[in-house]
């Protein structure tokens, strides 16, 4: 059963009316209602607030990394373990083909259903997850395979055990190593891009965001609690933090925005998956045609956060 957010109530009502018209066999009413639905969807989704976009990024029906991997990766083979400690189920690693192009895919997976969410630790990786990702990145480099990374996490796991096993070191090591990989790297934020937990697999030649995803240094709720001691100021925090694709593209922090189906990726995961596939293939061709892509990646990374002071 489809889950509708509070701002989608009118869409839900029209959808229910369409289903009733189908039961009655009333094709004329169905056609009229479908036109109303299309108009309503366009009206709502063209005027979304940043808070509503955050709700979409966290939508329980939103496609996760495994959904996209199952749809776009063929002849896939999953690889486990970090060769140091354990296998972290919050990070998934695959070898496979996208349109006959051999690739390595690394993704952060939140899981569906209580048991799977617990198995995946709600998509919050431990150090062994980031080390598994690095192991696969080095494998890709050795065999000259491009890398697709799918980012979707509220953040790296903040537990005591994770800190004892070097959470910050694992993330920092990934930032360092991914910056110098000698193969094309493409990262897509598909839902939540939470702080260092996202950055650990977001250093790439091309960094894109799905239209209704977010990328932030802290959750808006956490920001509101720290700055105003009031979690109810989440919407104020969102505006101040500039976490939407549009804001980040304007700031030069991401390269591209991947458009979603009219009602979001959660309403049509097949179209969303195909869009990601086409983006990956187009970006890969662009990178492969550039003999200086490593230098360009370095220059892009070094330019982040730079500024020029005004002259008096």
From Swiss-Prot:
Q: Ranges for the CoA carboxyltransferase C-terminal domain?
A: 36-286
| Reactions listed under catalytic activity | N(6)-carboxybiotinyl-L-lysyl-[protein] + acetyl-CoA = N(6)-biotinyl-L-lysyl-[protein] + malonyl-CoA
- Listed EC numbers: 2.1.3.15
* Entry keyword set: ATP-binding, Cytoplasm, Fatty acid biosynthesis, Fatty acid metabolism, Lipid biosynthesis, Lipid metabolism, Nucleotide-binding, Transferase
A GO CC term assigned to this protein in UniProt: acetyl-CoA carboxylase complex
Tell me where it resides: Cytoplasm
Taking the first listed entry, what is the main subcellular location of this protein, grouped into a coarse class?
cytoplasm
PROSITE patterns the record matches:
COA_CT_CTER
The Gene Ontology terms for molecular function here are: acetyl-CoA carboxylase activity; ATP binding; carboxyl- or carbamoyltransferase activity
Pathway(s) where this gene product acts: Lipid metabolism; malonyl-CoA biosynthesis; malonyl-CoA from acetyl-CoA: step 1/1
Q: How does it assemble?
A: Acetyl-CoA carboxylase is a heterohexamer composed of biotin carboxyl carrier protein (AccB), biotin carboxylase (AccC) and two subunits each of ACCase subunit alpha (AccA) and ACCase subunit beta (AccD).
Matching PANTHER family: ACETYL-COENZYME A CARBOXYLASE CARBOXYL TRANSFERASE SUBUNIT ALPHA (PTHR42853), ACETYL-COENZYME A CARBOXYLASE CARBOXYL TRANSFERASE SUBUNIT ALPHA, CHLOROPLASTIC (PTHR42853:SF3)
| General function of this protein | Component of the acetyl coenzyme A carboxylase (ACC) complex. First, biotin carboxylase catalyzes the carboxylation of biotin on its carrier protein (BCCP) and then the CO(2) group is transferred by the carboxyltransferase to acetyl-CoA to form malonyl-CoA.
Q: Which HAMAP family match?
A: AcetylCoA_CT_alpha (MF_00823)
Q: Which family does it belong to?
A: Belongs to the AccA family.
Q: What is the name of the protein in this document?
A: Acetyl-coenzyme A carboxylase carboxyl transferase subunit alpha
Originating organism: Helicobacter pylori (strain P12)
């Amino acid at each position: 059963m489809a889950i509708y957010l509070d701002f989608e109530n009118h869409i839900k009502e029209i959808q229910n009316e369409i289903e009733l018209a189908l039961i009655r066999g009333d094709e004329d009413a169905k056609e009229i209602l479908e036109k109303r639905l299309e108009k309503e969807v366009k009206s709502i989704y063209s005027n979304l607030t940043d808070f509503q976009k955050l709700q979409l990024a966290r939508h329980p029906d939103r496609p996760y990394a495994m959904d996209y991997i199952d749809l776009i990766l063929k002849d896939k083979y999953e690889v486990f373990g970090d060769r140091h400690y354990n296998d972290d189920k919050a990070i998934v690693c695959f070898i496979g083909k996208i349109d006959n192009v051999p690739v390595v895919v690394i993704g952060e997976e939140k899981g569906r259903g209580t048991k799977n969410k617990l198995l995946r630790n709600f998509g919050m990786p431990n150090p062994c997850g980031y080390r598994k990702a690095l192991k696969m990145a080095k494998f890709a480099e050795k065999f000259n395979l491009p890398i697709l990374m799918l980012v979707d996490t509220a953040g790296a796991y903040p537990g005591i055990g994770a800190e004892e096993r070097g959470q910050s070191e694992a993330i920092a090591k990934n930032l360092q190593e991914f910056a110098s990989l000698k193969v094309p790297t493409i990262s897509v934020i598909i839902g939540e891009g939470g702080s260092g937990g996202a950055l650990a697999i977001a250093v790439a030649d091309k960094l894109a965001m799905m239209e209704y995803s977010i990328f932030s240094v802290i959750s808006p709720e956490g920001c509101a609690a720290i700055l105003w001691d009031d979690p109810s100021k989440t919407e104020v925090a969102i505006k101040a933090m500039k976490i939407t694709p549009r804001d980040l593209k304007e700031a030069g922090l991401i390269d591209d925005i991947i458009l979603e189906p009219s009602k979001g990726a959660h309403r049509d995961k097949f179209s969303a998956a195909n869009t990601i596939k086409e983006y990956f293939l187009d970006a890969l061709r662009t990178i492969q045609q550039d003999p200086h892509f490593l230098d360009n990646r370095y220059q892009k990374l070094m330019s982040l956060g730079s500024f020029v002071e005004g002259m008096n």
